[in-house]
Amino acid sequence: MKNNSKLRSWLDDLNLDHPLVIAGPCSAETESQVLQIAHDLKNSDVSIFRAGIWKPRTRPGNFEGVGSIGLKWLQKVKKETGLLITTEVANANHVKIALDHDIDVLWIGARSTVSPFIVQEIADVLQNTDKIVLLKNPVNPDLSLWYGGIERLYSCLLYTSDAADDRM
């Protein structure tokens, strides 16, 4: 896989004089909690506000996140603070819903990264978009698994000519 510096332009467009900082609550629990934290971070070095909307849990019955209602809270964060917004997506349906809510940055969490099937389904949904996607390291230290996820996402970009032309 060839490194393409043009794919980095979204980061350069932020015109940062400091490292990129992404911050926010691990889990969005209430609208007021999300908005309060976002306003507290607004005048800091934070460029991207993050909040977990869907929380993958090992056992059913534990808090699994507020779901898509939380995406409306993130939209409010962007409107009120000007911060870019991001959340974790764990499957193709999450991506579709996040795209419908114009979430700026998507991240694929460590649990999803370990499944090539999930990463491919997410990549397929992202075709014809110019969405920024971050891929977390897998829960087990397997560099080839992580690299495979990057290749799947990168291939999605390469085979999407309009989006690739816009981003390069």
At which residue positions do the language-model features occur?
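Active-site mouth loops of central-metabolism enzymes
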Residues: 20-34, 62, 86-88
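Glycine-enriched alpha-helix->loop->beta-strand junction motifs that scaffold or abut catalytic
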Residues: 45, 99-107, 125-132, 154-158
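Glycine-rich, proline-tolerant flexible connector loops at the mouths of alpha/beta enzymes
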Residues: 50-68
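Single conserved hydrophobic/aromatic residue that forms the stacking wall/gate
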Residues: 159-168
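Catalytic beta/alpha-barrel core
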Residues: 84-91, 104-115, 132-141
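Alpha-helix-loop-beta-strand connector modules within alpha/beta enzyme cores
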Residues: 64-86, 125-128
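Active-site glycine- and acidic-residue-rich loops that bind
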Residues: 25-35, 136-148
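N-terminal amphipathic alpha-helix/helix-capping segment at the start of soluble metabolic enzymes
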Residues: 1-22
